């Protein structure tokens, strides 16, 4: 029925391709005309297009001519000409959609079309890849096209930024690879100011966060996010979607508890009754805990809780879940997960120097620098007995989902996106268009072979490898873990089959291994090939053989002459071409999958390694009923029982029913993971709106030259609030005393002669106006004393410091809220609704805290502005240093308790830490409790700085102010509009 309607209505993807065909025909029609242009005339097209855009034409209007220009420039510079299907891919990318293009179809070349077109607007465009190498190679390879057409190209990596310059030769680059030699080092800002910038998703995201930690406009590097093409878009926007980018700093927590819990959980016994049986059949666990493998969660049984309470020495009558013991449950849960769910060489590896490194479950890559959050990484370090690193506190964070949704126009390309089209549409508003291949796909995807046990499956894999190896066909074996790849490697070694292993432990040889995986008789064992970014060429890659041929002649790349290198390359090229033709005759690359992945997309990526650009090839998956996917989601027990009774262990089962079961299991897991990611977005959207408000405020402070009026408004609002609080029942001595005490924390210059007694006869309105006038006078005096320019700097630094300190604490509080809010589901409340309600309340509190921080610090900071600015500079340097090394970090968010600064031992003649400029004995001596309260409202993370000598001019000014304070003769406020509550008849532009 579905096929009937598809034939009746036509496939929507085919309709989309047909709709674009007239544009392709127009580009082809322009081809001969553009081919007749001289180089100068072709280059001049760029200026012509820019002028036409300025005159009112749109990008769509000039698209055919722009694409024809790039096509001709590519042919002249790098010898490649875009196929028609590549033109279709370029149009799809320009339209802000995802182009699904199979392996080997030339995505790197396709991207030049929309990048050039959109760069003509002069707002900067980004090409996002999954690693630094691919970004640098891609930009360097396509660089001659852009340079020929007068566009600049930048490249950013974690520790490097550069501009493409054909006249520059990098002395440290391999001179044989022209893609890498013409990168001239530049500043980060210059790389972003280029017309086109290539880089990784991590670096673009981290630069955004770093920009929003800057204390000066000169530190900003990014422009407004205009247009981006995301390569391997499914990997970045789906696989990495739940992994936030986090810049963090150290938080102090004891590692002893992790070690204690790691030893303790080894005494607990796992229940043989599964989570599924507990939930569906109502069976009681027969151990201390049981595991839900589907959600990777661990649940303690009643028996387990009692056992833990004894092991933790919790007194009788008290519970592990009482508030005073509740923190320990977090350590217990992490220790259990580390011991019983996370496996070495599957989920992580331990390096020779004792570091726990996460293994990417989708690509099999080691991810140094990334750490699991919430103490899980520390729990695994305790389990493995390696040094435990400190937990961290989040300084800035954003998910890829929210970062990439900030671009005005977003597009993507990958070999596998169609199965995830619903998620791309719902979360990113991106349509997926499958681009036809240039040559027909002739790869044979053979039926799965399913065995009862894992042992039988691996024996079958070995037999198939031997069979292919004997006839000379190259074989690629894909595994889902380092452990499996090592196991297969041992079996192949025992069988005498030479092979290469590519996994997280051997990543440094990755490019060389993949480049030669298509040679005759080659056998390559690799963890998931997703994101490798290197094509497997039948017959091998000649570039990778040059060094080998030179070595046989006693030469190296450094000692060989250019003629010797050219001769070696010609020899390698002849060999690989001959081998390639022979391998094609044998049937091409054979891909073996040893386990189905949770996502069909990853399986398709593995299959896609064979049959590139019309080459022959084949693929087959070998499965067992003990595989994780079938064990977690399939009707394993019933089928396994039948197979053990009626089928020999080495005889595979090939049944359509089980194929449907596997696909159904994958679909369910994909749906489950989609729901989780959608859930993540719904929660993070709340935080994202708040982040945008805070970051916009930071940017406004950096951009605005004068924040004086805003600061005075905040101070006026605080004074009004304090008057309402302390004089709510009328003007009395107690209320006035408290009001003046608080006011002096804002403005320490209020004369001692101003007391509750002297103000007792005034009305609330008169008192308010008196304090506001005094405040403006003090502010004007401080500005005159240190100079307007310095005062503006103090304002910016105080305001940015207040935002950053409060934001860090807010991120921690929001993380705690997000973890705890899920308990609302048990109270029959919608966790998302409760999260929104509580987060809005907390955000209002955050804004109030920021204002409070600014108001109570600005005048004291102006008295000791040199020391204060030095403190801020040191704090900023630490934060920026943390941000700069954040290129490889990931989820490291940790909870912490608010840090409070305590008053140090102060000498009688030392300057008072409140910032008044007076000696301690004349200021807060005898009122240390007030000083402590004041200090705890000062910057919590500001480092202690020794008192600095005051410049003579400042000392003289301070002496005048001190004399005025002592004599009660501060100058009257200058006549200006009162900064207080105004009569209702007088309209105000903004509330003070």
Swiss-Prot record:
The organism's place on the tree of life at top rank: Bacteria
Essential cofactor(s): Zn(2+)
UniProt EC number: 7.4.2.8
Keyword field contains Amino-acid biosynthesis: no
Region annotation (Disordered) ranges: 885-910, 965-992
Gene Ontology CC terms: cell envelope Sec protein transport complex; cytosol; plasma membrane
Catalytic reactions on record: ATP + H2O + cellular proteinSide 1 = ADP + phosphate + cellular proteinSide 2
Molecular-function GO terms, alphabetical: ATP binding; metal ion binding; protein-exporting ATPase activity
Quaternary structure annotation from Swiss-Prot or TrEMBL: Monomer and homodimer. Part of the essential Sec protein translocation apparatus which comprises SecA, SecYEG and auxiliary proteins SecDF. Other proteins may also be involved.
PANTHER family per UniProt: CHLOROPLAST PROTEIN-TRANSPORTING ATPASE, SECA INNER MEMBRANE COMPONENT OF SEC PROTEIN SECRETION SYSTEM
Protein name, per record: Protein translocase subunit SecA
Lineage: Bacteria, Bacillati, Chloroflexota, Chloroflexia, Chloroflexales
Name of the encoding gene: secA
């Amino acid at each position: 029925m579905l096929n009937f309607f598809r034939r009746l209505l036509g496939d929507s993807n085919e309709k989309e391709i047909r709709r674009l065909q007239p544009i392709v025909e127009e580009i082809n029609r322009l081809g001969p005309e553009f081919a007749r242009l001289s180089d100068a005339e072709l280059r001049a097209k760029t200026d012509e297009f820019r002028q036409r855009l300025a005159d009112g034409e749109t990008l769509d209007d000039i698209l055919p001519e722009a694409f024809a220009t790039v096509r001709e420039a590519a042919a002249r510079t790098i010898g490649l000409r875009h196929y028609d299907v590549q033109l279709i891919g370029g149009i799809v990318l320009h339209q802000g959609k995802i182009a699904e293009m199979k392996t080997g179809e030339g995505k790197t070349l396709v991207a030049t079309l929309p990048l050039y077109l959109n760069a003509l607007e002069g707002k900067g465009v980004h090409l996002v890849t999954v690693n630094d190498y691919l970004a640098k190679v891609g930009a360097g390879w396509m660089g001659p096209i852009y340079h020929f057409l007068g566009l600049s190209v930048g490249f950013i990596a974690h520790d490097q930024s550069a501009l493409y310059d054909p006249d520059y030769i990098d002395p440290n680059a391999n001179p044989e690879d022209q893609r890498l030699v013409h990168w001239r080092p530049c500043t980060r800002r210059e790389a972003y100011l280029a017309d086109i910038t290539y880089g990784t998703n991590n670096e673009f995201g981290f630069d955004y966060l770093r920009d929003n930690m800057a204390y000066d406009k000169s530190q900003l590097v990014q422009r407004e996010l205009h247009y981006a093409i995301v390569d391997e878009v499914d990997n970045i926007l789906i696989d990495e979607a739940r992994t936030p980018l986090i810049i963090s700093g150290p938080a102090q927590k004891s590692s002893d508890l992790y070690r204690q819990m790691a030893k303790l959980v080894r005494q607990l016994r796992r229940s043989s009754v599964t989570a599924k049986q507990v939930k569906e059949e109502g069976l009681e666990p027969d151990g201390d805990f049981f595991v839900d493998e589907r959600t990777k969660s661990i649940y303690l049984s009643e028996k387990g809780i009692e056992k833990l309470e004894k092991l933790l020495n919790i007194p009788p009558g008290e519970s592990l879940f009482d508030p005073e013991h509740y923190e320990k449950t977090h350590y217990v849960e992490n220790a259990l997960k580390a011991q019983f769910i996370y496996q070495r060489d599957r989920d992580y590896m331990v390096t020779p120097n004792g570091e726990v490194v996460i293994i990417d479950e989708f690509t099999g890559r080691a991810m140094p620098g990334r750490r699991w959050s919430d103490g899980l990484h520390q729990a695994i370090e305790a389990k493995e007995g390696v040094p435990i690193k400190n937990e961290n506190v989040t300084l800035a964070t954003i998910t890829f989902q929210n970062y990439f949704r900030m671009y005005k126009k977003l597009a993507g390309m990958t070999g596998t996106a169609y199965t995830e089209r619903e998620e791309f549409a719902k979360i990113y508003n991106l349509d997926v268009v499958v681009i036809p291949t240039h040559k027909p796909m002739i790869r044979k995807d053979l039926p799965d072979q399913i065995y009862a046990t894992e042992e039988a499956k691996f024996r079958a894999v070995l037999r198939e490898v031997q069979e292919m190896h004997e006839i000379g066909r190259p074989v690629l074996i894909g595994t889902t873990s380092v452990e499996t790849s090592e196991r297969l490697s041992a079996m192949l070694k025992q069988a005498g089959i030479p092979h290469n292993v590519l996994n997280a432990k051997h990543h440094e040889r990755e490019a060389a291994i993949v480049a030669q995986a298509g040679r005759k008789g080659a056998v390559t064992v690799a963890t998931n090939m997703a994101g490798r970014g290197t094509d497997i060429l039948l017959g091998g890659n000649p570039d990778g053989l040059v060094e080998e041929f030179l070595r046989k002649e006693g030469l190296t790349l450094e000692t060989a002459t250019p003629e010797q290198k050219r001769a070696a390359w010609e020899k390698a090229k002849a060999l690989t071409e001959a081998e390639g033709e022979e391998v094609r005759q044998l049937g091409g690359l054979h891909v073996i999958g040893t386990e189905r992945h949770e996502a069909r997309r990853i399986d398709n990526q593995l299959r896609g390694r064979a049959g590139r650009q019309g080459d022959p090839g084949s693929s087959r998956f070998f499965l067992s009923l003990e595989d994780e996917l079938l064990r977690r989601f399939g009707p394993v027990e019933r089928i396994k029982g039948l197979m053990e009774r009626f089928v020999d262990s080495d005889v595979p089962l090939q049944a359509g029913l089980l194929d449907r079961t596997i696909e159904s299991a994958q679909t369910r897991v994909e749906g489950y993971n989609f729901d989780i990611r959608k859930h993540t977005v719904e929660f993070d959207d709340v935080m994202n709106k708040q982040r945008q408000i805070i970051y916009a405020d930071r940017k406004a402070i950096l951009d605005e030259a004068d924040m004086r009026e805003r600061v005075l408004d905040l101070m006026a609002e605080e004074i009004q609030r304090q008057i309402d609080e302390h004089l709510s029942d009328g003007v009395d001595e107690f209320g006035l005393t408290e009001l003046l005490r608080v006011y002096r924390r804002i403005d320490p210059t209020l004369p001692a002669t101003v007391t509750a007694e002297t103000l007792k006869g005034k009305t609330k309105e008169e008192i308010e106006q008196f304090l506001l006038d005094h405040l403006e006078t003090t502010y004007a005096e401080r500005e005159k004393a240190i100079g307007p320019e310095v005062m503006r700097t103090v304002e910016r630094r105080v305001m940015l410091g207040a935002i950053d300190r409060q934001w860090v604490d807010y991120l921690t509080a929001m993380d705690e809220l997000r973890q705890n809010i899920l308990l609302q589901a048990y109270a029959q409340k919608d966790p998302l609704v409760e999260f929104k309600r509580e987060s809005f309340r907390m955000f209002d509190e955050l804004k109030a805290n920021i204002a409070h921080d600014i108001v109570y610090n600005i005048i004291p900071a102006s008295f000791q502005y040199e020391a204060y600015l030095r403190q801020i500079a040191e704090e900023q340097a630490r934060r920026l240093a943390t941000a700069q090394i954040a290129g490889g970090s990931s989820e490291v968010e940790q909870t912490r308790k608010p840090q409070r600064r305590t008053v140090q031992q102060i000498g009688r003649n030392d300057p008072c830490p409140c910032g008044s400029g007076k000696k301690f004995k004349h200021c807060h001596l005898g009122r240390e409790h007030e000083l402590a309260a004041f200090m705890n409202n000062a910057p919590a993370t500001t480092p202690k700085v020794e008192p600095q000598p005051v410049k003579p001019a400042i000392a003289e000014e301070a002496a005048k102010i001190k004399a005025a304070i002592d004599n009660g003769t501060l100058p009257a406020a200058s006549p200006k509009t009162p900064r207080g509550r105004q009569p209702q008849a007088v309209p105000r532009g903004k509330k003070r």
